Amino acid sequence: MATIHLTKGQFKKRIADYEKSKEKIDFLGDKPAIIDFYAVWCGPCRMFSPVFEEVSDEYLGKVDFYKVNVEEEEELAALFNVRSIPTIVFIPMNGNYRIVQGAIGKPQLKQAVDEILL
């Protein structure tokens, strides 16, 4: 399993220290990243989770895959204005992050990773 569950502290070290710069996110990673915002009680999140895990294994070493539980990390969810779950945030090495709301299938997730991150 190549997915890492993020806390606020880990987010500030691996993704961005958003408390330093409120205007924009200065990405700290050495590889593009994708974050799945979810909740354990969310049916669509539970359906999407195995897809996310499979794709994370396929892109191991190329893209960092993270998960954030919105109930445990409300501040991180607010940072990306997460209003529905699952919400998937794609963070490329250069350029602005992109957000996709709702569960997507494996082909769509792989296409998004290839087009947005690689």
Question: In which residue ranges do the predicted regions lie?
Answer:
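A short beta-strand-turn-helix
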Residues: 6-33
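Conserved helix-turn-beta segment immediately C-terminal to the redox Cys motif
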Residues: 30-32, 49-68
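Short pre-active-site segment immediately N-terminal to redox-active cysteine/selenocysteine motifs
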Residues: 30-33, 37-41, 84
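Structural signal for short hydrophobic segments within the conserved structured cores
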Residues: 4, 66, 97-100
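Conserved redox-active cysteine motifs that mediate thiol-disulfide chemistry
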Residues: 37-51
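Structural microenvironment flanking redox-active thiols in thiol-disulfide oxidoreductases
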Residues: 70-78
